[in-house]
């Protein structure tokens, strides 16, 4: 006769078998739904692509008709209505496509291959965006503290290398995460994307710059600038995140909009006090570029890193300054 303990084990196994049957059935249904989902995604993507092509052709035809024929007022109004409806339809397709798999861009393809990075629910998209914002905040604070230590406590090329390596890793990670967010509907584009690629290059060159007279002549200026930049980025995150939250609640901003290291039109209400901080930082970038160009002409300058750091600082200044200036100019034009 079996012992009570063995009988309990047999009974438990029987219960596990029943649960196992349920698990198998659930998993079968799950795989079936996945196959159905893949078919729906393919069909939806194809239909949207065809519609977008037709809309593009229609826009071209309307433009040609408007420019070639002297239209009566009624026709002009009809063309305006059609163009407006086309723009609305394009925005709707943009929203739809953010939930559909898409081919990765060149950068993501090089880094991740052909892995699908599209998140399929609003919750997962927002969670990833929120995690990205927290990552920026925490790393900005760490970089601010580390730049302070390197500037005022430890004068060592080793700690400087650690700081520069952290900058390279930080900006590389930002570019990857931003590319994933763009694939999922975030509308960060233009200069604010390119800005981080340039920062990655600049940090990499700073990391390879050997210790010497030229490095020591620029070191304190660079670390002081890094401290100030981290401080301004912290201010921007703190105030932009609050502003974005209010605008999302009012339905004036998209859920996937991100904080940026600059000034955009939506920041005009409540965030104009940041402009002096931004302009000061941008002219500091110009000052860094001028300093490096002067060092490049120094008789003892032999390092290629000097000129290769000066150029990115100059590009940073031009991009940041004129992008900010354009936003301010457009806002004043609208008000007038």
Curated annotation (Swiss-Prot):
CoA binds at residues 129, 186-187, 236, 239-240, 331. The chain crosses the membrane at residues 132-151, 158-176, 190-208, 218-239, 270-293, 304-329. GO terms for molecular function: coenzyme A binding; monoatomic ion channel activity. It holds the Pfam family TMEM120A-B. Keywords: Cell membrane, Endoplasmic reticulum, Membrane, Nucleus, Transmembrane, Transmembrane helix. Its main location: membrane. Multifunctional protein involved in mechanosensation, and plays an essential role in lipid metabolism. May function as a potential ion channel involved in sensing mechanical stimuli. TMEM120A is structurally similar to a lipid-modifying enzyme, ELOVL7, and contains a bound coenzyme A molecule, which suggests it might function as an enzyme in lipid metabolism. The transmembrane domain (TMD) has structural homology to the very long chain fatty acid elongase 7, ELOVL7, despite low sequence homology between them. Belongs to the TMEM120 family. This is Transmembrane protein 120A. The gene is tmem120a.
């Amino acid at each position: 006769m079996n012992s009570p303990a063995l009988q309990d084990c047999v009974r438990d196994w029987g219960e596990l078998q029943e649960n196992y049957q349920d698990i198998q059935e659930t998993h079968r249904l799950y795989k079936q739904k996945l196959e159905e989902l893949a078919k729906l995604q393919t069909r939806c993507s194809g239909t949207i692509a065809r519609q977008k092509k037709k809309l593009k052709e229609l826009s071209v035809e309307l433009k040609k008709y408007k420019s070639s024929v002297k239209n009566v007022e009624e026709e002009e109004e009809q063309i305006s209505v059609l163009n407006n409806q086309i723009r609305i339809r394009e925005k709707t397709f943009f929203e739809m496509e953010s939930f559909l798999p898409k081919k990765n861009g060149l950068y993501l393809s090089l880094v991740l291959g052909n892995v699908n990075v599209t998140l399929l629910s609003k919750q997962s998209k927002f969670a990833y965006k929120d995690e990205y914002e927290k990552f920026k905040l925490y790393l900005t604070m760490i970089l601010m503290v580390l730049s302070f230590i390197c500037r005022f406590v430890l004068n060592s090329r080793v700690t400087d290398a650690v700081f520069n390596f952290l900058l390279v890793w930080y900006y590389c990670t930002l570019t990857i995460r931003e590319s994933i967010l763009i694939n999922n509907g975030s509308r960060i584009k233009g200069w604010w994307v390119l800005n981080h690629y340039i920062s990655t290059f600049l940090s990499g060159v700073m990391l390879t710059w050997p210790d010497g007279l030229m490095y020591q002549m620029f070191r304190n200026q660079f670390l002081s600038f890094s401290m100030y930049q981290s401080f301004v980025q912290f201010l921007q995150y703190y105030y932009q995140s609050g502003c974005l939250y209010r605008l999302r609640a009012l339905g004036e901003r998209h859920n996937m909009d991100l904080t940026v290291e600059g000034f955009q039109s939506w920041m005009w209400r409540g965030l104009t006090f940041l402009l002096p901080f931004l302009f000061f930082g941008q002219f500091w970038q110009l000052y860094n570029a001028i300093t490096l160009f002067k060092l490049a002409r120094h008789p003892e300058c032999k390092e290629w890193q000097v000129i290769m750091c000066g150029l990115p600082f100059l590009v940073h200044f031009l991009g940041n300054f004129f992008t900010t200036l354009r936003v301010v100019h457009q806002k004043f034009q609208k008000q007038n």
